[in-house]
Amino acid sequence: YTRGDKKIGYLVYNHFTPGPNGYSDRTYDEEMKKIFAGFQAQGVNEFVLDLRYNGGGYENSANMLAGLLIPEASRKKVFAVFSDNKGQSYSNDFCVETKGTAGYLKLNSNRIYILTSQSTASSSEVVINSLNPFMDVILIGELTEGKNVGMEMQKNDKYEWMYWPITLRVTNAVNYDYSAGFKPDIEWNE
């Protein structure tokens, strides 16, 4: 979309999945890089990310999307901090391998608009939280769910069962806790 000197990019993203065949398939992540290369080629300088219907998914895909959006000066900063109930924690930096694509979206401002709803949760909230310390994140919509926890699959092949217990609490580079959800800057109900 073009409005005056603004070239506005819009992306709706409904689930953080790297590819159709699970974690090791990166088909969708690679397609996302191509989409962002297109935004870059079109000179997009404002961006709207629609996460209203995104309940989460894989953290690596969320990191990849946030890495495409983060300002250049913040590319090697902390994306998220994961802490377990034993007091152990580790962090992931923003990361994207561009491999021949135009790469990151270079906005003329350090601002992004993100559309939210009550269904915006988990990895979607991690994206919001990870960008907050490094750019002006303007939320439009409804209060998000507040799911700031992560899970790890536990599997028993002998009895053919698996479960996903909550094992991690997720914060950002400044240790922000969003368990009550993110309140929108501009409230808007669909």
Regions found by a protein language model. Give the residues of each.
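C-terminal "post-core" interaction segments
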Residues: L11, H15-S24, K33-K34, G38-E46, ...
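Beta-strand-turn-beta hairpins that frame and shape the catalytic cleft
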Residues: Y1-Y10
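Short strand-turn motif at the edge of the Rossmann-like AdoMet-binding core
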Residues: R52
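P-loop NTPase catalytic core of nucleic-acid-dependent motor ATPases
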Residues: L49
